[in-house]
Amino acid sequence: MIQAETQLNAADNSGAKRLYCIKVLGGTRKRYASVGDIIVVSVKEAIPNAKVKKGDVLKAVVVRTQKEVRRPDGSYIKFDDNSAVLINQAKEPIGTRIFGPVARELRAKQFMKIISLAPEVL
């Protein structure tokens, strides 16, 4: 459950380390983002000589949340951290690698490139 002002980890090799949620996209009443939702983020911490710099405002897709997500079969999945992957205007990841597992819910939201780059899909 991600909302405005939430800090997240970057789960890719775009160069960002910490992200800060500015806005949850999806209408005026959408307050919280879950796995697979797109958010607007600011890069709070980045490594030197990277694709993104500190202060950049980009879009990202949430891939892991500490708040559990209920699945249609009644099971729940939750992760140890809140993480997102930075994406461009075409909804393709900026980085070339994804770190850590990602949730299966991304497949239903058509983020196939992130699914294929991820080492594990839970």
Swiss-Prot record:
Superkingdom as given in the UniProt entry: Bacteria
Name under which the protein is recorded: Large ribosomal subunit protein uL14
Subunit relationships: Part of the 50S ribosomal subunit. Forms a cluster with proteins L3 and L19. In the 70S ribosome, L14 and L19 interact and together make contacts with the 16S rRNA in bridges B5 and B8.
Coiled coil residues, start to end: none
GO function term, MF aspect, one: structural constituent of ribosome
Keyword rRNA-binding belongs to the record: yes
UniProt family annotation: Belongs to the universal ribosomal protein uL14 family.
BP GO annotations: translation
GO cellular component terms attached to this protein's record: cytosolic large ribosomal subunit
Listed InterPro entries: Ribosomal_uL14 (IPR000218), Ribosomal_uL14_bac-type (IPR005745), Ribosomal_uL14_CS (IPR019972), Ribosomal_uL14_sf (IPR036853)
Function in brief: Binds to 23S rRNA. Forms part of two intersubunit bridges in the 70S ribosome.
UniProt KW RNA-binding keyword: yes
